[in-house]
């Protein structure tokens, strides 16, 4: 009780003196005191205080809103679902799977095979209830979470960081990338250079969206939410077919032939996550269509990367969906 009182006083300060917070992050690790005692936390009290003082803040990891992806290596699932069975917000379960000591081998561990599937129909069929629990992938730009001069030559490469970004931010997960300050209280020059290279690459890649000027059609819609709506990168407008139409095709006729390397898909997640399988096709000069990418889940964002293809038209084929698919955005780059 004394610890919880002290903690809530500090939490009150943090939630009232620093403006609006987008997240309150509780680590899964629970360290022992010098006497071997592990603190027992009054989680419900903490959550209630945050909801009162910062109602828009997402409570992450050991909390009810944002789920830890299950590793610190930057590994991700091929099919990342945000709709899960209830029970994944148990802080004790999160703590049991978290790092128990400063362990380099733990930070290299990938998602276990038994936790690759958390949200498929098979996994959900006997669930007592369901919850919206999007994933956060947390990893470090260096081998560990803190700065060590001896690791200045072990900063992750730009290529590795971009791969992690595409698999997380482009794979229906969020990304927490740890950048530890050095003994000067600054980010080390090598780390900064990697981040600049990463940012420059992403800005260049996504500078021009060919879908903005494309003619967009769908083989069906519900009469109220046309395919044209996927130009807008927001949740105010979206494309939707009639209920029960779980397989649809959207066609994008570009203004002129372009070299295309990326396609971005976003579901209208205010109406949940629905898509289970999709394919991206490019039109060849002879008029035939060739599949250039195929995937499973989409969620808030899925980014497909592929070898450059020159084309003047692309098709997004939703092959299967739990209920009729609802897309808020499609980008072609």
Spans of model-derived segments:
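Beta-strand signatures of extracellular beta-sandwich domains
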Residues: 279-281, 331
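Edge beta-strands of jelly-roll/beta-sandwich modules across compartments, strongly enriched
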Residues: 322-333
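A generic beta-sheet turn/junction motif
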Residues: 256-258, 284, 309, 320
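Exposed beta-strand face motif in extracellular beta-rich ectodomains
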Residues: 312-314
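Mature catalytic domains of secreted/periplasmic carbohydrate-active enzymes
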Residues: 1-246, 251-252, 259, 264-267, ...
């Amino acid at each position: 009780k004394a610890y919880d009182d002290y903690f809530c006083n500090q939490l009150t300060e943090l939630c009232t003196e620093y403006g609006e917070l987008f997240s309150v992050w509780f680590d899964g690790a629970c360290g022992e005191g010098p006497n071997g005692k592990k603190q027992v936390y009054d989680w419900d009290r903490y959550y209630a205080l945050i909801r009162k003082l910062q109602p828009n803040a997402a409570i992450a990891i050991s909390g009810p809103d944002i789920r830890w992806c299950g590793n610190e290596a930057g590994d991700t699932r091929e099919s990342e679902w945000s709709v899960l069975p209830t029970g994944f917000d148990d802080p004790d379960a999160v703590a049991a799977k978290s790092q128990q000591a400063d362990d380099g081998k733990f930070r290299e561990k990938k998602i276990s095979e038994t936790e690759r599937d958390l949200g498929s129909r098979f996994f959900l069929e006997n669930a007592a209830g369901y919850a919206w629990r999007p994933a956060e992938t947390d990893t470090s730009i260096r081998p560990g979470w803190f700065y060590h001069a001896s690791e200045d030559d072990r900063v992750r490469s730009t290529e590795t960081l971009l791969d992690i970004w595409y698999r997380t931010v482009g794979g229906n997960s969020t990304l927490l990338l740890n950048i530890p300050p050095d003994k000067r209280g600054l980010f080390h020059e090598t780390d900064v250079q990697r981040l600049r290279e990463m940012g420059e690459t992403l800005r260049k890649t996504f500078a021009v969206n060919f879908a903005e000027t494309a003619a967009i059609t769908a083989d069906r819609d519900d009469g109220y939410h046309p395919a044209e709506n996927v130009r807008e990168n927001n949740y105010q407008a979206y494309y939707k077919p009639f209920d029960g139409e779980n397989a649809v095709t959207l066609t994008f006729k570009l203004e002129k032939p372009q070299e295309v390397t990326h396609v971005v898909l976003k579901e209208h997640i205010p109406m949940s996550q629905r898509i289970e399988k999709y394919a991206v096709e490019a039109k060849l000069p002879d008029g035939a269509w060739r599949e250039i990418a195929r995937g499973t889940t989409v969620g808030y964002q899925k980014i497909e990367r592929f070898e450059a293809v020159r084309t003047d038209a692309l098709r997004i084929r939703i092959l299967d969906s739990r209920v009729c698919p609802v897309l808020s955005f499609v980008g072609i780059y």
